[in-house]
Curated annotation (Swiss-Prot):
<dbReference type="GO" id="GO:0032677">
    <property type="term" value="P:regulation of interleukin-8 production"/>
</dbReference>
<feature type="disulfide bond">
    <location>
        <begin position="100"/>
        <end position="150"/>
    </location>
</feature>
<keyword id="KW-1064">Adaptive immunity</keyword>
<dbReference type="GO" id="GO:0006954">
    <property type="term" value="P:inflammatory response"/>
</dbReference>
<dbReference type="GO" id="GO:1900017">
    <property type="term" value="P:positive regulation of cytokine production involved in inflammatory response"/>
</dbReference>
<keyword id="KW-0202">Cytokine</keyword>
<comment type="function">
    <text>Effector cytokine of innate and adaptive immune system involved in antimicrobial host defense and maintenance of tissue integrity. IL17A-IL17F signals via IL17RA-IL17RC heterodimeric receptor complex, triggering homotypic interaction of IL17RA and IL17RC chains with TRAF3IP2 adapter through SEFIR domains. This leads to downstream TRAF6-mediated activation of NF-kappa-B and MAPkinase pathways ultimately resulting in transcriptional activation of cytokines, chemokines, antimicrobial peptides and matrix metalloproteinases, with potential strong immune inflammation.</text>
</comment>
<keyword id="KW-0325">Glycoprotein</keyword>
<keyword id="KW-1015">Disulfide bond</keyword>
<dbReference type="Pfam" id="PF06083">
    <property type="entry name" value="IL17"/>
</dbReference>
<dbReference type="GO" id="GO:0051216">
    <property type="term" value="P:cartilage development"/>
</dbReference>
<dbReference type="GO" id="GO:0032645">
    <property type="term" value="P:regulation of granulocyte macrophage colony-stimulating factor production"/>
</dbReference>
<dbReference type="GO" id="GO:0032755">
    <property type="term" value="P:positive regulation of interleukin-6 production"/>
</dbReference>
<dbReference type="InterPro" id="IPR029034">
    <property type="entry name" value="Cystine-knot_cytokine"/>
</dbReference>
<dbReference type="InterPro" id="IPR020440">
    <property type="entry name" value="IL-17_chr"/>
</dbReference>
<feature type="glycosylation site" description="N-linked (GlcNAc...) asparagine">
    <location>
        <position position="83"/>
    </location>
</feature>
<feature type="disulfide bond">
    <location>
        <begin position="105"/>
        <end position="152"/>
    </location>
</feature>
């Protein structure tokens, strides 16, 4: 399970970097008329616009990921577990999301301390979403907010006037 989560996280991070590279570089090759399928010619698929690019979604050098200690989510004062979300109309189709194990934080004795709060750390990522018209090779770039870990914070206290 850990290997699957790490692979999914690496894929998510690589896709995020790919999206930033496409957006930030003006050198993205544009092919507005290449690869029109019969569905697109019939008008059922969205037309390729000037802001369209062709992307090879195969991930190269998958085994050259950054080496990270495997148990950091267990050693944290705000530990978490990963849940895999699956969506066949999204690339990557599997994304690992963190879920905090406790509402409080873990103290030095290993006990939950309710005077502190365990909260998720969120990261915005870019994913490719398949267009709903049944165009198998038509995707749009979409932002997603995912939980990547948890951290321990002081609670927000509201004082009654």
């Amino acid at each position: 399970m850990k290997g699957s989560c790490e692979t999914t996280m690496v894929k998510s991070l690589l896709l995020l970097m790919l999206g930033f590279a496409i957006i930030s570089s003006g050198a993205a090759r544009r092919n507005p008329k290449v690869g029109l399928s019969a569905l697109q010619k019939a008008g059922n698929c969205p037309p390729l616009e000037d802001n369209s690019v062709r992307v090879d979604i195969r991930i190269f050098n998958q085994n050259q990921g950054i080496s990270v200690p495997r148990d950091f989510q267990n050693r944290s004062s705000s530990p978490w577990d990963y849940n895999i979300t699956r969506d066949p109309d999204r690339f990557p189709s599997e994304i690992a999301e963190a879920q905090c194990r406790h509402s409080g934080c873990i103290n030095a004795q290993g006990q939950e301390d309710g005077s502190m709060n365990s909260v998720p750390i969120q990261q915005e990522i870019l994913v490719l979403r398949r267009e709903p018209q049944g165009c198998s090779n038509s995707f749009r770039l979409e932002k997603m907010l995912i939980k990547v870990g948890c951290t321990c914070v002081t609670p927000i206290v509201h004082h009654a006037a």
